[in-house]
Amino acid sequence: MAPLSSMMNSLQGPLSQEGKLQERKSDKEDAQSNDKAAVKGCKGKALSLPFSVESLISDRTSSRTLYTSSEAGIISPTSGADERLKLSPMALYADRKIPVESVSNLSDCKRGDMEELSDKGQSGWFQTTSYTSPPRHSSPPPCTLRKHKNNRKPRTPFTTSQLLALERKFRQKQYLSIAERAEFSNSLNLTETQVKIWFQNRRAKAKRLQEAELEKLKLATKPLLPAFAFPFPLGTHVGSPPLYGPSSSFPRPALPVPGLFGGPVTYGMYYLS
């Protein structure tokens, strides 16, 4: 008997393990079928709502078929009003008679989806975005002024006596020869280059002054209005009939005024210099 009982126990051990595995598989299949049924129920509820995308599309297709059928014949106003009442959201809601529980369940499903999307969006925002300061443009370099050469000699001002002597010599002769310039520079204790440059500057100044004087003379001689003259001298009879009184065929002698007008008079206006 003892060996038979041990044999039975050894056979019952693997059988019990196989039964447990089958029970676990059946439990998993039941859970998956329940999840699929819940998802299908949510989708069916979403499809049954009057304001869902599918219901709106179906309403549009029905209204289009009505319009196409109305093009074939004339629809009476009463029938059009009836169709509008039938297609109104309130009528659709009353016809379908959607229970309140399905609406609440669908709203819960939509809220859960919106929360998941918002959580994903916030996590992506915090992960991807990072504040970076805009790059600053470097300030432009300061304007560098032109510097004089280092080997340039300092400017030495002329004395009053030297200026008077140079001006007197310039009035006598504007261009000096090499010998005259050497002798004149030695007499004033100046270099030939200084005398040469002074004469060049003085000639340029004299040219500018001369051009300014010529411009003034042009403005002074230019009249403001063009001069005009009478076509006949004053004091002569033109032969026009008198304005008042009877006309006579004899010419009326003019009385000349001695010393007043001897010829044609011209008038002109000029600028005052």
Swiss-Prot record:
SUPFAM superfamilies: Homeodomain-like (SSF46689)
Gene Ontology terms, MF aspect: DNA-binding transcription factor activity, RNA polymerase II-specific; RNA polymerase II transcription regulatory region sequence-specific DNA binding
GO biological process, one term: regulation of transcription by RNA polymerase II
Biased composition (Polar residues): 1-15, 120-136
Subcellular location: Nucleus
Cellular component GO terms held in the UniProt record: nucleus
Basic residues: bias regions: 145-155
Location of region: Disordered: 1-41, 114-159
DNA-binding region: 151-210
Entries under InterPro entries matching the protein: HD, HD_metazoa, Homeobox_CS, Homeodomain-like_sf, Msh_Homeobox_Regulators
PROSITE patterns assigned to the protein according to its UniProt record, in alphabetical order: HOMEOBOX_1, HOMEOBOX_2
Family (UniProt): Belongs to the Msh homeobox family.
Designated name of the protein: Homeobox protein MSH-C
Organismal lineage: Eukaryota, Metazoa, Chordata, Craniata, Vertebrata
